[in-house]
Amino acid sequence: DGAFSIIRKKMVSTYNHKYDYNEIDHDYKELLIPPAEDGKHLLDMNALHIWPRGDFMLMALANQDGSFTCTLFAPKKGKNSFEKLNSKQEVEKYFSSVFPDFIGLVPDLYSQWCANPTSSLGIVRTDPWNVKGTSLIIGDAAHATVPFYGQGMNAGFEDCRILNELLDNHNENFAACFEEYSKVRKPNGDGVQDLSMHNFIVMRDKTADPKFL
């Protein structure tokens, strides 16, 4: 039932399961590059576009209608942070100085800025993922992660595949299946989260190095 799972909350409060939610120091906001007048993409549609700036970044992914969904990942507070961007003048100055080749692609930048929410990012860790043979959490309820490795949904699908295999292996003995599932999948959930945080550093910082390409 998702990253803010009620089932997990009940497991933690009733059975004293380990639980940690780590909200990272960066928030994000989505913006949109519209299509060109002829309906075509203004940037290469077959590329992942990243503007790496060390501690923060902007990225853009192509949509089928000629637009690009863009996401700014920036610190909550401090230099180059969301807390500094509270007026039209501040937002336009920020993008003009930090992303000068981007601002011209979004003519309604400030109206988008005001309309789209600034949202947080975090990682969920809990252990175990089951209560005997009565209940089990999978997907984001068990291992919600940040999006920088692009494998969160795949990890959830993998949960389903492994769970089906274990149900067969244990002849649908839920208690035995759930216990093994929790032990087998927990390290994988942690691993995807660690890789996601590592890749955030790579994307926002390391991709600026010509040697990376």
Regions from the language model: what does each represent?
Residues G2, G139, G152:
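Conserved phosphate-binding and hydrolysis motifs of nucleotide-dependent enzymes
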Residues A74-K76, A141-A142, S196:
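Short, histidine-centered active-site or binding-site loop motifs used for metal coordination
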Residues D140, C160, Y181:
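Hydrophobic, well-ordered secondary-structure elements that form the walls
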Residues P147-E158:
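A conserved FAD-binding loop/helix module that cradles the flavin
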Residues E165-L213:
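C-terminal helical "tail/cap" subdomain of flavin- and related membrane-associated enzymes
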